[in-house]
Each structure stands twice: as C-alpha cells, then as structure tokens.
Amino acid sequence: EDDLSDFNPKV
C-alpha cells in the first residue's frame, strides 16, 4: 500500500 501513497482517498 506504500505505492498507493499517491492515491490515498482514505487519508
């Protein structure tokens, strides 16, 4: 999920 750092709607 580190790669999803660019796409984190949960944040």
From Swiss-Prot:
Keywords: Secreted. Expressed by the venom gland. The keyword Secreted applies. It is found in: Secreted. GO terms for cellular component: extracellular region. The keyword Secreted applies. Negative results: does not show activity on voltage-gated sodium channels, potassium channels, and calcium channels. All the following channels have been tested at 10 uM: Kv1.1/KCNA1, Kv1.2/KCNA2, Kv1.3/KCNA3, Kv1.4/KCNA4, Kv1.5/KCNA5, Kv1.6/KCNA6, Kv2.1/KCNB1, Kv3.1/KCNC1, Kv4.2/KCND2, Kv4.3/KCND3, Shaker IR, and Kv11.1/KCNH2/ERG1, as well as Nav1.2/SCN2A, Nav1.4/SCN4A, Nav1.5/SCN5A, Nav1.6/SCN8A, Nav1.8/SCN10A, and DmNav1, and the nicotinic acetylcholine receptor alpha-7 (CHRNA7). Belongs to the SA81-like family. This is Venom peptide Sh42.
